[in-house]
């Protein structure tokens, strides 16, 4: 099985710092990222799906780390890269 190299957008890095300050359990995020980096299947509790109606996140997916904490990511298959695009609450990222 091929592992994807993990890359972080600048927006993601800033958002991650915010999640840490808010006391989020970053281990939950790391576990999900590990599964995604191996192109593994997430459990249905993560509600993983492609974002289709949001032009800001073209070709991206989102999954729920917690009920109101999501991770937006995309695969760059030609380069074997998992790009972490953003993280935060649904209302911060998608309810606009």
Model regions: which residues?
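Basic nucleic-acid-binding interfaces
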Residues: 1-3, 10, 56-59
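Enriched for short, Lys/Arg-rich terminal
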Residues: 1-5, 14, 26, 63-70, ...
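N-terminal first-folded block
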Residues: 8-43
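Residue-level marker of positions within ordered structural domains that often coincide
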Residues: 17, 56, 78
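A short, surface-exposed loop/turn module that caps and links secondary-structure elements
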Residues: 37-64
